[in-house]
Amino acid sequence: MISAYLPSFFVPLVCLVFPAIAMAFLFVQIEKEEIV
């Protein structure tokens, strides 16, 4: 029965946390490169 609740836990995790980490990583890379 626990597996029935996993999607409702992973969907916000993937849709909110992963993009936040990706944007933070890209921001650090851009700041490190100093292209702007």
Swiss-Prot record:
Highest taxon in the source lineage: Eukaryota
Protein name: Photosystem I reaction center subunit VIII
Native source organism of the sequence: Chara vulgaris
Lineage: Eukaryota, Viridiplantae, Streptophyta, Charophyceae, Charales
Cell compartment(s), UniProt: Plastid, Chloroplast thylakoid membrane
Annotated disulfide bonds: none
Keyword list, A-Z: Chloroplast, Membrane, Photosynthesis, Photosystem I, Plastid, Thylakoid, Transmembrane, Transmembrane helix
Family stated for the protein in its record: Belongs to the PsaI family.
Gene name of the encoded protein: psaI
Membrane topology: Single-pass membrane protein
